Amino acid sequence: QLNMALMLFLAPSSDELDHVLGEQPYYDIDDVRLTFSPKDFIQVNRDVNVKMVEQAINWLDIQPQDRVLDLFCGLGNFSLPLARRAKAVVGVEGVDEMVARATANAAANGLDNATFYQANLDEDVTKLVWAQEQFDKILLDPARAGAAGVMQHIVNLAPSKVVYVSCNPATLARDSQMLLQQGYKLARLGMMDMFPHTGHLESMTLFVKTNHHKKNSNVM
């Protein structure tokens, strides 16, 4: 449910936001409460977002032993529902404030198996602590610019399944080529009307690793 109580925030400057009245706004998704600030990025269409999270969980077929990597994780929209089912979830996000919010949301929901890191995913991440870990499945939900900077690392990690959520068909098509060329097949494709009465759609794709493809020589 979306908290609909009266809330009042004042912005004395572009860098400040004072919480004057009411609770912190929140979404309830899959028995997880996600609190956020009016300045945070969050999916505006709660009902479609809930369905999108449910579909991602189903497509990834999360098992109790799975370790899951959530790239461009924001405040934990996918990470925390995934952590309800997986052994461990690592979320990576470029904005410090969102990493702090995701960490606080994990603690508030009693999810000690979700860990969050700040990183610029347009740069080489291979030497970062979280990038040295192994993951069974990966979800990514980048901005319109896509995820070109991290696609090679996703391939190197060799997860069994990848769910890519996109708001830009052009960058989704570009980034998908890396997966298709490295032994993944497109197993599912869905469209979600996140923004009714506009020309914008949210896409979700599931890629599944096949066994007959020889690994790329860059794989570590």
UniProtKB/Swiss-Prot annotation:
Alphabetically ordered keywords of this record: Methyltransferase, rRNA processing, S-adenosyl-L-methionine, Transferase
Listed InterPro entries: MeTrfase_TrmA_AS, MeTrfase_TrmA_CS, SAM-dependent_MTases_sf, U5_MeTrfase_fam
Highest taxon in the source lineage: Bacteria
Gene3D superfamilies: Vaccinia Virus protein VP39
Signal peptide from the UniProt entry: none
An annotated Gene Ontology molecular function: rRNA (uridine-C5-)-methyltransferase activity
Reactions accelerated catalytically: uridine(1939) in 23S rRNA + S-adenosyl-L-methionine = 5-methyluridine(1939) in 23S rRNA + S-adenosyl-L-homocysteine + H(+)
GO process terms (BP): rRNA base methylation
Pfam families tied to this protein: tRNA_U5-meth_tr (PF05958)
Assigned EC number: 2.1.1.190
Cysteine pairs bridged by disulfides in the record: none
Residues annotated as the enzyme's active site: 167
Sequence positions that bind S-adenosyl-L-methionine: 43, 72, 77, 93, 120, 141
Functional description taken from the UniProt entry: Catalyzes the formation of 5-methyl-uridine at position 1939 (m5U1939) in 23S rRNA.
Similarity-based family: Belongs to the class I-like SAM-binding methyltransferase superfamily. RNA M5U methyltransferase family. RlmD subfamily.
Protein name listed in UniProt: 23S rRNA (uracil(1939)-C(5))-methyltransferase RlmD
Species assigned in the record: Photobacterium angustum (strain S14 / CCUG 15956) (Vibrio sp. (strain S14 / CCUG 15956))
